[in-house]
Swiss-Prot record:
GO terms for biological process: translation. One of its GO terms (molecular function) is structural constituent of ribosome. Signal peptide: none annotated. Belongs to the bacterial ribosomal protein bS20 family. Keywords: Ribonucleoprotein, Ribosomal protein, RNA-binding, rRNA-binding. Residues 1-26 are annotated as: Disordered. It comes from the Bacteria. Binds directly to 16S ribosomal RNA. The keyword Glycosyltransferase does not apply. This is Small ribosomal subunit protein bS20. One of its GO terms (cellular component) is cytosol.
């Protein structure tokens, strides 16, 4: 455990952000799963509607640094291609 005051503070901040980011990552995976389930059910309307929401989430997380911007672009590109193939 840290002995220096600033190190203790950083440890607390790190733990807080870890929990916050874990929650956000779970939410992101849920959005992705909704799109994938709609694609597997061949429901283009629902898949498109969920994909619009997902794009917003991925872009905001890429901006905030939760995921890399290229990761966000790759996920959007692959899901978009699957939706277009329906």
């Amino acid at each position: 455990m840290a002995n220096i005051k600033s190190a203790k503070k950083r440890a607390l901040q790190s733990e807080k952000s870890r929990k916050h980011n874990a929650s956000r990552r779970t939410m992101m995976r849920t959005f992705i799963k909704k799109v994938v389930v709609a694609i597997e059910a061949a429901n283009k309307e629902v898949a498109t509607a969920e994909f619009v929401k997902l794009q917003s989430v991925l872009d905001s997380y890429a901006t905030k640094g939760l995921i890399n911007k290229n990761t966000a672009a790759r996920k959007k590109s692959r899901l978009s291609a699957k939706i277009k193939a329906l």
